[in-house]
């Protein structure tokens, strides 16, 4: 069981690193089309977005926008945040799938 947890954690973090690399290497350095610029601006200025809101996204985007050296880098930082949060989602999805698969396949968890 200890060996399984070690391998599961290592593969999960490897999956995160691969996803983060792919997402961060393909981010849009500026504001793109549709809702993306609106979310970037509402995160940077903490203004009110359109009705769905996404307040957690805006608060975290505001945190990441403080790492920008100037205002022209805000879009890159918010898009980097989106890439890292998406990679984190893939990490937890991997761990969820392996947990459920192990639970379905094995009758006894000590195997």
Where are these regions (language model features)?
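Extracytoplasmic catalytic/substrate-binding loops of multi-pass membrane glycan-assembly enzymes
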Residues: 27-39, 49-61
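Transmembrane signal-anchor helices characteristic of membrane glycosylation enzymes that use polyprenol
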Residues: 6-33
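Short hydrophobic/aromatic helix or loop-helix immediately within or flanking a transmembrane segment
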Residues: 50-73, 80-84
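Membrane-water interface at transmembrane helix exits
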Residues: 22, 27, 61, 65, ...
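Transmembrane-helix motifs of polytopic, lipid-linked glycan transferases
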Residues: 13, 17, 80-109
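Membrane-interface starts of transmembrane alpha-helices
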Residues: 7-11, 70-81, 111
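Juxtamembrane helix-capping/reentrant segments at transmembrane boundaries
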Residues: 44-45
